């Protein structure tokens, strides 16, 4: 399960950014995952729940946005979404397409409560 190592790095980044912002705690993390990123949301959530204990990210809500896969034909330049004929260009019927979107996995935003807010 590679989600464990992915989530460990994700948490390190989140905690570092939150501490840099002098946050009291992290309340929400918005993540973007491409259709072909190979990341399982439920596994990331489970790993995050366990790994974030005793950190300022404990209890934070993870929100996921999905980016659909998109391809570009290397023969004619046409861009197209994934479909039944995965890598076949619908324009020229060529079999030489590259993925131009859908492999992403990144933190879009982190919502925090800062130290200046009273308890």
From Swiss-Prot:
Keyword Zinc-finger carried by entry: no
Gene3D superfamilies given in the database record: 3.30.2320.80
GO molecular function: nickel cation binding; zinc ion binding
Keywords, comma-separated and alphabetical: Metal-binding, Nickel, Zinc
InterPro entries in the record: Hydgase_Ni_incorp_HypA/HybF_CS, HypA/HybF
Source superkingdom: Bacteria
Record flagged with keyword Aminoacyl-tRNA synthetase: no
Its job: Involved in the maturation of [NiFe] hydrogenases. Required for nickel insertion into the metal center of the hydrogenase.
Identification of the protein by name: Hydrogenase maturation factor HypA
The encoding gene: hypA
């Amino acid at each position: 399960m590679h989600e464990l190592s992915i989530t460990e790095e994700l948490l390190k980044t989140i905690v570092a950014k939150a501490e840099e912002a002098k946050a009291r705690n992290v309340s929400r993390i918005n993540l973007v995952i491409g259709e072909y990123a190979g990341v399982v949301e439920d596994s990331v959530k489970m790993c995050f729940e366990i790994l974030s204990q005793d950190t300022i990210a404990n209890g934070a809500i993870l929100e996921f946005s999905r980016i659909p896969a998109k391809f570009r034909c290397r023969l004619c330049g046409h861009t197209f979404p994934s479909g039944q004929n995965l890598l076949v260009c619908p324009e020229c019927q060529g079999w030489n397409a590259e993925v131009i979107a859908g492999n992403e996995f990144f933190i879009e935003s982190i919502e925090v409560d800062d130290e200046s807010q009273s308890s």
